[in-house]
């Protein structure tokens, strides 16, 4: 039976602004998203029957039809009237419920993997159109690299970034945060500081990590930090260990710091990992989902 291996990469937000709440309940956002070299390994293998069977090494994610990667496979099969079945195995390395789009990345990898495995010939744009019906971050995870995301996150403008291979340290505290609860608690009238998106985009294009680090802003911190003071604690530690800037990614609770060199990132990682079990040292990545 045919099979395919994929690397399903995480993302961080270099900025996140919420512009308004729509009548359908969704929030319109303006955010800069950056792929990083932290990934889950995914194996997709054909089955003799028509079933979708998902398994994983992680006890914290479902293996039923509620799993976003399962939904991606089901949606693609349904859309193209495909009766073939598949096994999906997810070797989870990206922290769960962390603001890093781990689930969305898995869904994107499944869409891309099945497109390749079954020689469907769908374009990235067509895959993104399917992906947005599953989750707002799925289109970016298909695109990869660096992008400005607008709408509910599905309107993407690729950015010609010059901050390639920048060293990042991530810390995911031992708490879980509900994205829905964070957005539900956000009071748009009380947001004072918003990301200077145009200036950030210019700094990214110029490869100026000092300006990127100093101008990063996430308005969702106004909610999550108040509920979970540990996020502020981690940000302070990042700066003490020579980060150029530190910020919460997405709705949290993961905090990341940007470092100007491998040596400084490694030193910070070694110190932070003494306090926080889920600490990671990674780089920015610009290659999208990797097959094989």
Swiss-Prot record:
Alphabetical list of Gene3D superfamilies matching this protein: 3.30.230.10, GHMP kinase, C-terminal domain
Q: So where's the catalytic machinery, residue-wise?
A: 11, 137
- What pathway does this protein act in? Isoprenoid biosynthesis; isopentenyl diphosphate biosynthesis via DXP pathway; isopentenyl diphosphate from 1-deoxy-D-xylulose 5-phosphate: step 3/6
- Give the residues the record marks as binding ATP: 95-105
Keyword tags:
ATP-binding, Isoprene biosynthesis, Kinase, Nucleotide-binding, Transferase
Query: What InterPro entries does the database record attribute to this sequence?
Result: GHMP_kinase_C_dom, GHMP_kinase_C_sf, GHMP_kinase_N_dom, IspE, Ribosomal_Su5_D2-typ_SF, Ribsml_uS5_D2-typ_fold_subgr
What is its EC class? Answer: transferase
Q: Which reaction does it catalyse?
A: 4-CDP-2-C-methyl-D-erythritol + ATP = 4-CDP-2-C-methyl-D-erythritol 2-phosphate + ADP + H(+)
**Keyword Kinase carried by entry:** yes
- What family does this belong to? Belongs to the GHMP kinase family. IspE subfamily.
Q: Which PANTHER family match?
A: 4-DIPHOSPHOCYTIDYL-2-C-METHYL-D-ERYTHRITOL KINASE, CHLOROPLASTIC
- NCBIfam families under this entry? ispE (TIGR00154)
Put simply, this protein is called 4-diphosphocytidyl-2-C-methyl-D-erythritol kinase
């Amino acid at each position: 039976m045919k099979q395919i291996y994929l690397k399903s990469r995480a993302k961080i937000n270099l900025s996140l602004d919420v512009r308004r709440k729509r009548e359908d309940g969704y929030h319109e956002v303006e955010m800069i998203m950056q792929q990083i070299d932290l990934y889950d390994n995914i194996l997709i293998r054909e089955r003799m029957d028509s079933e979708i069977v998902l398994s994983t090494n992680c006890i914290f994610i479902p293996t039923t039809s509620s799993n976003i990667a399962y939904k991606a496979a089901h949606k693609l099969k349904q859309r193209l009237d495909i009766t073939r079945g598949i096994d999906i195995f997810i070797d989870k390395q990206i922290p769960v419920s962390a603001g890093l789009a781990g689930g969305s990345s898995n869904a994107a990898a499944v869409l891309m993997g099945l497109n390749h495995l079954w020689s469907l010939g769908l374009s990235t744009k067509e895959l993104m159109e399917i992906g947005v019906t599953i989750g707002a971050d799925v289109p970016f995870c298909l695109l990869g690299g660096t992008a400005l995301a607008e709408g509910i996150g599905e309107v993407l403008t690729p950015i010609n970034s010059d901050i390639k291979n920048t060293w990042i340290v991530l810390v995911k505290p031992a708490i879980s945060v509900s994205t829905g609860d964070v957005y539900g608690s956000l009071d748009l009238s009380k947001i004072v500081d918003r990301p200077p998106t145009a200036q950030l985009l210019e700094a990214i294009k110029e490869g100026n990590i000092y300006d990127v680090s100093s101008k990063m802003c996430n308005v969702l911190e106004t909610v999550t930090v108040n509920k979970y003071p540990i996020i502020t604690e981690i940000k302070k530690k990042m700066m003490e260990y020579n980060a150029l800037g530190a910020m919460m990614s997405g709705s949290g609770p993961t905090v990341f710091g940007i470092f100007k060199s491998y040596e400084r990132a490694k030193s910070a990682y070694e110190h932070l990992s003494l306090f926080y079990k889920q600490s990671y040292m990674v780089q920015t990545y610009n290659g999208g989902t990797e097959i094989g």
